[in-house]
Amino acid sequence: METSQEPLVTQKKSKPSVWRSMSLFLVPLLLSNVLQSVGQLVGMMAVGRWLGVDAVAAVSSFFPLFFLLISFTIGIGSGSSILIGQAYGAKNEERLKAVVGTTLTFTFLLGVVLAVIGSIFTLDILRLMGTPENVIHVSANYARILFYAMPFMFLYFAYTTFLRGTGDSKTPFYTLIVSTVINIALLPVLILGMFGFPKLGIYGSAYATVISTIATFLVLMVYLRKRKHPLQFDKTVRRYLKMDKELLVLLLRLGVPASINMILVSLSEIAVISFVNHYGSNATAAYGVVNQVASYVQMPAVSLGIAVSIFAAQSIGANEFDRLKQVIRVGIWLNYIIGGVLIILIYVFSHQILSLFLTEQETLYIAHRLLMITLWSYLLFGNAQIISATMRASGTVLWPTVISIFAIWGVEVPVAFVLSHYTKLEILGVWVGYPAAFAVSLLLIYGYYQFVWKKKQITRLIQ
């Protein structure tokens, strides 16, 4: 393919090594994920310590539902990051702004639709999930607070995706610092009712999230305008708010399969938590806390998946296919180095970590067993994520999605159901489903990458 423009990143001869470039990009990205998890961790700790295990169970029951309803937007975001990366690599600022404008409008409208659906059907869905009756109404009301603010929260998430797509991982990190500080500062004020504010209990946690996110989005918009950033909300971006039909179709082609995958992942989590809920609120609380801890283990995988996708998209946009191969290799190595060290540390200090969230011995015991069974397998998850991210950056989204869906619904959910219902493992059988699914996913995704994708001719999507 002809390339008439130089890549935006830098001239080819002056580019640093992939190891250096990806590491420099990865540090703020990892710190962002750490900070985001710290914010969630502090929120969960505040709820658990101040309000008790039932409040933790209420929040834990809600998150699979929330993830289900935002899955489509996450998929669209992944599609927009591919297009942003390729446009940036091709040094095509007009198309860059077109992607921004089109994505913003579609994302906002989608947020409105999901806010309405979520607020109306929250209670019904939580009942289908088997949420314990002693927490279901609190969980539903907590959810509605976040749903009402969803359209505006989505705009903030979209802009952080755009920035990372251009190779800027620092600005999203700085804005996240602002958001986290505001959120943590508001938690005691709104939960306990301080400085004249009403005592909102568990709902104070939701309001703190909403206020901090929207405030940070406004700060980010002002910053981009003052810096005259290419992604600022200027006349060109506003012109494309009407949505470029060609780009929208391409965005949906890239984003819908990823969204379907996200939705089915969410449904699987709803299925899994329904298995867990069968064992009572202690098991539900343990599940929620271990998910928080596992989010730290997933950080290298998720961060590297984002980094590899962006670097791969920029390499494809600039027609630098030798660099693309290096991106894949470096991503896989970093996954095992960073993820391996983190997993070892969490295994060693597992009791101390879980005790930060939980005080009841039965819940601690359940959570510890879950952690021991599943933690190591996130290395396999990370490897599969990196290979999949590379293929998605080229526009190959269907088969990575099919493989992921099969691993979840053909392996994880059936294994969790059968082992928990028909063997002596009981609740331990639920946990075994995770490593089984991650192993199958890696084997299948690597097979497709090696024997099919590598034989394809790769061309950029943004012209």
Swiss-Prot record:
<feature type="transmembrane region" description="Helical">
    <location>
        <begin position="397"/>
        <end position="417"/>
    </location>
</feature>
<feature type="transmembrane region" description="Helical">
    <location>
        <begin position="106"/>
        <end position="126"/>
    </location>
</feature>
<keyword id="KW-0813">Transport</keyword>
<feature type="transmembrane region" description="Helical">
    <location>
        <begin position="24"/>
        <end position="44"/>
    </location>
</feature>
<keyword id="KW-0472">Membrane</keyword>
<feature type="transmembrane region" description="Helical">
    <location>
        <begin position="177"/>
        <end position="197"/>
    </location>
</feature>
<feature type="transmembrane region" description="Helical">
    <location>
        <begin position="56"/>
        <end position="76"/>
    </location>
</feature>
<keyword id="KW-1003">Cell membrane</keyword>
<comment type="similarity">
    <text>Belongs to the multi antimicrobial extrusion (MATE) (TC 2.A.66.1) family.</text>
</comment>
<dbReference type="GO" id="GO:0042910">
    <property type="term" value="F:xenobiotic transmembrane transporter activity"/>
</dbReference>
<feature type="transmembrane region" description="Helical">
    <location>
        <begin position="330"/>
        <end position="350"/>
    </location>
</feature>
<feature type="transmembrane region" description="Helical">
    <location>
        <begin position="370"/>
        <end position="390"/>
    </location>
</feature>
<feature type="transmembrane region" description="Helical">
    <location>
        <begin position="202"/>
        <end position="222"/>
    </location>
</feature>
<dbReference type="GO" id="GO:0005886">
    <property type="term" value="C:plasma membrane"/>
</dbReference>
<dbReference type="GO" id="GO:0006811">
    <property type="term" value="P:monoatomic ion transport"/>
</dbReference>
<keyword id="KW-0050">Antiport</keyword>
<keyword id="KW-1133">Transmembrane helix</keyword>
<keyword id="KW-0406">Ion transport</keyword>
<keyword id="KW-0812">Transmembrane</keyword>
<dbReference type="Pfam" id="PF01554">
    <property type="entry name" value="MatE"/>
</dbReference>
<dbReference type="InterPro" id="IPR048279">
    <property type="entry name" value="MdtK-like"/>
</dbReference>
<protein>
    <recommendedName>
        <fullName>Probable multidrug resistance protein YoeA</fullName>
    </recommendedName>
</protein>
<feature type="transmembrane region" description="Helical">
    <location>
        <begin position="293"/>
        <end position="313"/>
    </location>
</feature>
<dbReference type="InterPro" id="IPR002528">
    <property type="entry name" value="MATE_fam"/>
</dbReference>
<feature type="transmembrane region" description="Helical">
    <location>
        <begin position="427"/>
        <end position="447"/>
    </location>
</feature>
<dbReference type="InterPro" id="IPR052031">
    <property type="entry name" value="Membrane_Transporter-Flippase"/>
</dbReference>
<dbReference type="GO" id="GO:0015297">
    <property type="term" value="F:antiporter activity"/>
</dbReference>
<feature type="transmembrane region" description="Helical">
    <location>
        <begin position="143"/>
        <end position="163"/>
    </location>
</feature>
<feature type="transmembrane region" description="Helical">
    <location>
        <begin position="256"/>
        <end position="276"/>
    </location>
</feature>
